[in-house]
C-alpha cells in the first residue's frame, strides 16, 4: 500500500517549523526527529491559518 500524500506543502511545513522554533531539528535530522508535541502544534497552527483564510 502506498503512503498517503500529505495535505500541507513542504514550503508551508518549513514556514511553520521556523515560526514554531524547531526548523533546526528538521534540517539536521529530518521530519521524523520532531517531537509529537511539535507536530501537534504545527497542525494546530495550520488549522488556525486555514480558518483565518476562510473568514476572508
Curated annotation (Swiss-Prot):
The lineage of its organism: Bacteria, Bacillati, Bacillota, Bacilli, Bacillales. Keywords: DNA-binding, Sporulation. The keyword DNA-binding applies. Belongs to the alpha/beta-type SASP family. InterPro entries: SASP_alpha/beta-type, SASP_alpha/beta-type_CS, SASP_sf_alpha/beta. GO terms for molecular function: double-stranded DNA binding. The record marks 15-16 as: Cleavage. GO terms for biological process: DNA topological change; sporulation resulting in formation of a cellular spore. Pfam families: SASP. The keyword Zinc does not apply. The gene is sspF. This is Protein SspF. May play some important role in either sporulation or the dormant spore. It comes from Priestia megaterium (strain ATCC 12872 / QMB1551) (Bacillus megaterium).
